[in-house]
Amino acid sequence: HVRRGQILSIAKLGDSEAEAIELIAEEGSEIVRKPLQKIRFPKKTILGAIIRNNTMLLPKGIEAINPGESVVVFTLPDDIERVQALFSKKK
């Protein structure tokens, strides 16, 4: 897979198909400044944490991600590109 710059790290979770991805939310992306409950994540994707000011937050539906914040997402390989698109600046 070719992965764009906003992915900081990616790790396979044990023997499962699932992967944990750390991404940065880019200014102008679909994900920033919207309540998480309004974001359409792929069906088998979970937003596990938001890293804000060097502190890990467990996200709630009313929470919004700010540009430049990193997040940890759990997803399946088939959904990585869609997840990445949510965090990438719209062209």
What are these regions (language model features)?
Residues 22-89:
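Cytosolic Rossmann-like ligand/nucleotide-binding regulatory domains
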